């Protein structure tokens, strides 16, 4: 019999799944009371777009966000989104908040969403 992980994880959208046509900044995700986090980027259709994703971190929810150092990521942020893919990136940093920023260098659009999975909660969600 398999064990249940649903009650050991918490899933929060930082960029809700949508068709994007311009640069978008995700909402801050609070990592307080969690000892593990992963960022999941899910793409659908991509048309003439050159979106890149950057994961940012801060100790405050509304300001001070900077790019996460590569040493604090397990995996790479996509330089350009590819259609119908799922990318998972682990976060090992020590900041309380993370978010995703999608930057469009193209003239088209892309359908995607970015989700943060919080795990190893000190209190079950």
Describe these PLM feature segments.
Residues 7, 31-33, 55-57, 83, ...:
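Surface-exposed beta-strand edges and flanking loops
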Residues 71-76, 121:
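Short, solvent-exposed aromatic-acidic interface loops
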């Amino acid at each position: 019999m398999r064990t249940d992980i649903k009650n050991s994880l918490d899933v929060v959208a930082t960029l809700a799944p949508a068709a994007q046509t311009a640069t978008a900044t995700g909402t801050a995700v609070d990592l307080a009371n969690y000892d593990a986090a992963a960022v999941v980027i899910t793409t659908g259709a991509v048309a003439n777009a050159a979106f890149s994703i950057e994961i940012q971190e801060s100790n405050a929810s509304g300001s001070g966000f900077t790019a996460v150092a590569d040493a604090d990521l397990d995996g790479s942020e996509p330089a350009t989104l590819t259609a119908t893919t799922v990318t998972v990136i682990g976060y090992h940093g020590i900041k309380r908040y993370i978010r995703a920023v999608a930057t469009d260098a193209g003239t088209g659009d892309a359908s995607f969403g970015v989700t943060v999975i919080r795990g190893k909660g000190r209190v079950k969600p």
